[in-house]
Amino acid sequence: MNSRLQEIRERQKLRRQLLAQQLGAENADSIGAVLNSKDDQREIAETRETCRASYDTSAPNAKRKYPDEGEADEEEIEEYKDEVELQQDEENLPYEEEIYKDSSTFLKGTQSLNPHNDYCQHFVDTGHRPQNFIRDVGLADRFEEYPKLRELIRLKDELISKSNTPPMYLQADLEAFDIRELKSKFDVILLEPPLEEYYRETGITANEKCWTWDDIMKLEIEEIAAPRSFVFLWCGSGEGLDLGRVCLRKWGYRRCEDICWIKTNKNNPGKTKTLDPKAVFQRTKEHCLMGIKGTVRRSTDGDFIHANVDIDLIITEEPEIGNIEKPVEIFHIIEHFCLGRRRLHLFGRDSTIRPGWLTVGPTLTNSNFNAETYSSYFTAPNSHLTGCTEEIERLRPKSPPPKSKSDRGGGAPRGGGRGGTSAGRGERGRERNRTNFRGERGGFRGGRGGTHRGGFPTR
């Protein structure tokens, strides 16, 4: 409790220092000298009311009509002339811009001067993004309060490290390279193309060729995808959200999830130094679209996927300007979710070479890939799967068993009718209505406390 109170006090002290710097005060204790007092605020409010009243009477739609001849006396005509002269004098006055010395005008709520949890206003005042205050975002402390999940992650990491193939990498220009020469089908394909958007936002000249979405769409991903597989495509935060879906459809995948990378600025608070000319707001997140191919149900295909282990959010510190590398946590999410061992990373770099993955990219400085050696790791039956231990199976989140009508106290299943339950329309209807993996509840953990979305939407 004392440490928590101390942390709150330190944050309050930091905020006061930042406010003093922005308001031009000598120190945090002298902020009150530059802010409006209650009397000043009351005077400002009265002045506003007076201005509004005068504007209401002097507005163009509130102008009095010139009195008709014969219907008005001389006194009304004189009043009309005085009003016209007053309006002309006000129009000739120089415009004075009102200077706001504090944020009381923009406070959240109308009955209180306390901004409470108005993180958006706090960002305006201090430059700290709202996502800076989300707790337990790191891999080390995320499951600190959930011992079962922490143990599950530990066991899965051990199993993955034991079943990983040696890291392989291939330096190749993907624009000219025929990816069918890899001579393998992959369970997971991760694409990290160097989009023009990344360099357009930073204003830095690209040190590698930028790919357009037309170029990305020409990649023959469908030729190397296993019958049931997943693709993860980093698509930025602009036009790629729509064009990325087009790519997934072209490759034979259905979009089933959107993993968001939320960027914090705890170490360097302030406004974004660069802004995409096509953007209206400052963009502080990126998206990774996830596609599914084939039929995969989380309730029956536990040999291939383990759902609800991770969340669909990645929250890390924003990298330096010009650094377009993605957080390493995306690899953990993929490895925890899909039990397939044949993993391919396209547009990889030397820094992303990883056990259990085949990394292909134009910026790699070396190659050790051999198609026959790589295929030899998966010759035995089911050798393309990591497998699962009894302890992991016991700890991992599972889908609740489906409830039938008899379980709820009903009678025979619908469609039993003539010919018995097996011949009725109900059984065929249930078979027809069985959805694939995306139709069932979430692929990733929906997040505790309602912070995150709960999985794959239905079509």
UniProtKB/Swiss-Prot annotation:
SUPFAM superfamilies: S-adenosyl-L-methionine-dependent methyltransferases. Signal peptide: none annotated. Keywords: Differentiation, Nucleus, RNA-binding, Spermatogenesis. InterPro entries: METTL14-like, MT-A70-like, SAM-dependent_MTases_sf. It comes from the Eukaryota. It is found in: Nucleus. The keyword Cell membrane does not apply. Transmembrane segments: none annotated. The METTL3-METTL14 heterodimer forms a N6-methyltransferase complex that methylates adenosine residues at the N(6) position of some mRNAs and regulates the circadian clock, differentiation of embryonic stem cells and cortical neurogenesis. In the heterodimer formed with METTL3, METTL14 constitutes the RNA-binding scaffold that recognizes the substrate rather than the catalytic core. N6-methyladenosine (m6A), which takes place at the 5'-[AG]GAC-3' consensus sites of some mRNAs, plays a role in mRNA stability and processing. This is N(6)-adenosine-methyltransferase non-catalytic subunit METTL14. The gene is METTL14.
